[in-house]
Swiss-Prot record:
Gene3D superfamilies in alphabetical order: Jelly Rolls
Lineage: Bacteria, Pseudomonadati, Myxococcota, Polyangia, Polyangiales
Annotated binding of Fe(2+), by residue: 96, 98, 102, 140
Keyword match Amino-acid biosynthesis: yes
Protein name listed in UniProt: Acireductone dioxygenase
Site, as annotated: Important to generate the dianion: 104
The organism of origin for this protein: Sorangium cellulosum (strain So ce56)
Keywords attached to this entry: Amino-acid biosynthesis, Dioxygenase, Iron, Metal-binding, Methionine biosynthesis, Nickel, Oxidoreductase
Annotated site location: May play a role in transmitting local conformational changes: 101
Record site: May play a role in metal incorporation in vivo: 95
Name of the encoding gene: mtnD
Amino acid sequence: MSRLRVYRESDPTRADEYTTLEDIARVAAEAQIRFERWSAERPLPPGAAQEQVLEAYAGPVKQLSEACGFVTADVVSVSPGTPNHPELRRKFLDEHIHTEDEARFFVEGRGLFCIHHGERVLSFLVEKGDLISVPAGTRHWFDMGPEPSFTCIRWFSDPKGWVAEHTGSDIASRFPRLEA
């Protein structure tokens, strides 16, 4: 079940928690974050290739691309069998920004998408069917957990795809992580 925990930047031990789609979307919107629940029921073979995932979700990919001006989409899929998953986890765990909007739709699995907004940290447990989109310049990080298992579609305005600018902050290390 999707969940949002909102922490004060200065206190990673206490949070307000939201579990309904309506509450999560409302609190997210207050921080200029888009959170929606989409259908993720298209059949995919185990270990589906990027082309298979994008083809299965061609309609939603095209619709969001046209609505938001995205020019490319890719698929990231990580499992415990992915040889470099510890390095991938570390790569996404540091707080960073993008110079473009970022959107992710979880086709399978789950992850912890954290937004550093003002003096708060919004920690979204995103799961199959969740779409989260953040505007350019939003400080954030993503935790796939020690035993990752997810597939998500990512949209970009820049044809180069995922390009992060790390902030140098250690804030992500002070907040709860996604555990197995």
